[in-house]
Amino acid sequence: MSQHTYSLTHAQRRVWFTELLESGTSICNLTACVKFRGNIDLDVLEGALNHSISRNDAIRFQLLEGEELEPRLYLTEYKYTSLEIIDFSNVEMIEIEQWIQEQARIPFKLFNSPLYQFYLLRIHNHEVWLFAKFHHIIMDGISLNVMGNQIIDLYQKMKKQDPLPDQPEPSYLSYIEKESQYLQSSRFAKDRLFWTQTFQNPPEYHSLAGQTSLQKQSTSASRDTITLSPHLGQTIRIFCEEQKINIISLFMASFYICISRITSKKDLAIGTYYGNRGSKAEKEMLGMFVSSLPIRITADPDADFLSFVRRVGREQLSVMRHQRFPYNLLVNELRKEQKDLHNLIGISMQYQPLQWHNADGFDYETALYFSGYTANELSVQIQERTDTGTIQLNFDYQNTLFSLEDIKRIQNHLLTLLENALQHPHSFIKELDMTNKREKQKLLYEFNKTEAVSPEAPTLHGLFERQAAVTPERPAIRFSGGSLTYAELDMYAGRLAVHLAARGVTRESIVGVLSKRSPEMLIAVLAVLKAGGAYLPLDPAYPKERLSYMLKDSGAALLLAQPGCSAPNFSGETLEVDMASLASEKAENDVFTPADGCSLAYVIYTSGSTGKPKGVAVEHRQAVSFLTGMQRQFPLQEDDIVMVKTSFSFDASVWQLFWWSLSGASAYLLPPGWEKDPALIVQAIHQESITTAHFIPAMLNSFLDQAEIERLSDGTSLKRVFAGGEPLAPHTAARFAPLLPQVSLIHGYGPTEATVDAAFYVLDPERDRDRLRIPIGKPVPGARLYVLDAHLAVQPCGVAGELYIAGAGVARGYLNRPALTEERFLEDPFYPGERIYKTGDLARWIPEGHIEFLGRLDDQVKIRGYRIEPGEIEAALRSIEGVREAAVTVRTDSGEPELCAYTEGLRRNEVRTQLERLLPSYMIPAHMIEMERWPVTPSGKLDRNALPAPGGAADAETYTAPRNVTEMKLAQLWEDVLKNGPVGI
């Protein structure tokens, strides 16, 4: 006779899908102990257990392997269960708990086998525990308590020899039938409408885990438990009683606020669990009923806390009225419109009341145990002991996403915010702090503790002049075809400065310097400074229109030009810098208007959001402080030689032009054009014994290729390489160490507005091996770094916020842009009288006291309804082994915004395959373009505007950008002919 089988309910189906995804694990195990204290008759207890098993069909369900992926249920006949007694009376409690945890982690045999297991544990003479383990497909947490109460009731009746109930308990089969009817009912249609309207535009899923490593997500989990202080527990209970709110509403509201701040998102969903037992019979029934459902809340920072708690409570009640609707059907409904929909629930919270109950001659309670797995990245259980008043929080967390330290921080954030909210329940949410005083102290002061800087001179040229007086005959600069000593360079600059002073250059005068990399360039810069003025660097490679704009906008009346360079349409005076003429001049007494530390030193133009570049005005004291701090952190010696290879229109040139002069070291001026050719750079390093160089990350990869070819590590003079201008990819950093093991790699970060670099990070191959992002490090001496929220409140460690820079390096402001200066240069809220610079960069502190750069705040885009940070995709791309460099942009060539990824070093199909393992599908770029050479701006940064559009050759083959004017013209001609996207070389 064939066996009758039944379909899984939707609640059971969710469990089964979890089992399929995590097969061979204990993720679906439900383990508990009913703990008895008193004189317990073990034979009677065994009889009570068996009577309960016989009367509840849900326990006796087994699984039959189906033809499809989904199994069928069938009901087995009752068989008496003899309890094995394990004696733990002479064993420490920690060993007992360990044994239980080990049992909890043993998975069940799934098919044609009992899905329950029982033992009796003798703890001591007056305490015994009934150990029970079930597969979640036949039992939920409420059922455990129901069964525990049944066993107690049966035990007492058997002890008193009272008649036992002869009717079976309500059957789970009736629930299976009832759910089938519900799915065809008008109630189901109403519930479906509620849920689909609530999540019509679902909130973006943002992980609470601030991943810094390449670990892949796994359901393997750990638990950390905290017990609230008696005072806090009592305060919570009194508050909830007075305000007539539930503890779960209070905790969930507080948790919403924490998550909102950690993820920088207001629209959030947190999962919680509902019994899903509508009738009296269902409340007494054993089986799997529980619904896991998302509660969606918008955390408005301008709402007051108490009102927000009440709103959370109303949402909980609203969800409760529609709890029967299966969660898996909700996700399926939403995926009809959004195929890329991520899981709605990543974080969950639930409330569990616990207590010891009194019975005739004994006490008892039911305790649940952790399986070692969790389907959510973080699950929080609030356990309140109603007998003692103790409140305990269990944090179950996926340990590939979180460390214990991460969880401790989240706990501290939650409790700090909760305590502040209880003291000030009518405060606006934005006013409630979740960073305690100790953490604030660490973030503001300890992490920003640097060595004090005491410059040897107040001005840039003063530093040089001081060294020229000490080591006049030492070589200051070397270049193709010659060199100049400190005394000679000082002489040339001084003689030119006389001409400048005669033309009215004085303090605050801005003088343009138009020159390729050459001794004339440095002579002109020093001459302007000596005369008291400020230099405006002008790279001849810049478009003429841009040069004209900068000269006009800066108000420069005088232009110093290298022979052969000119600026069309410049209405002021142009003075050619001719070394031969200067050498033949007679020495004159230098009579200049001396600059001081507060005088303007230089103006460097950076890209502006309006399309017009903006001039950043930097004073001597800011530049001198930065250079002094740099020398303190990375001391140069007299035998050091710094390679000057960056365009002096880019702020990284400042340390290349001046740093070496603090110690009597030398600079080597790389011939113009050589900076684009790694072979020539390596040649210069060999021939000139270069010790210090700077690269943007894209060029660093090409340099490493050449270093590998030429075995540069064999006896190289290099001591240190700085990488900056763009985020440094972990793969690039990983390549560096084996190729140049004796050379330090230093990741630098800093906007022009903070005087070159505000932070440095010295890489360590072992420590940084598994990082997802290379940190930008700690502040340079004299600087401070703050990570703040939109209200200038301190963001906790690990939480993203906007990066602000404070300290001695903060520039004067934007030239002739008072409104923009006021917008970006603010009062320092922590050091009265000082200023901070608002970078517009997203960053966070990581536990070891370093800053991690996360991207630009204004780079976020919305693609197909999802808000996406291209920098996050870039970080994932750079983490793929074999990818040397990556960039992600948003293109609208097709009429709709699409993500386009550019990569170097790995075939795009392989990149896509690897990326799909790291990111959800909605973050996978629509286009992948392979690059061999990257277009860069004259300042050496990646020129994102020059990246090729998708389609045609660029999207089909490895793309090499045009490298010079001739190639650009040829490429343009072919593009006009082919009409098929960009043409590479």
Residues of each region from the PLM?
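His-Asp-centered acyl/peptidyl-transfer active-site segments
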Residues: 2-4, 19-30, 57-58, 126-127, ...
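Extended, hydrophobic beta-loop-alpha segments that form or line the acyl/peptidyl-thioester binding
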Residues: 56, 60, 145-151, 248, ...
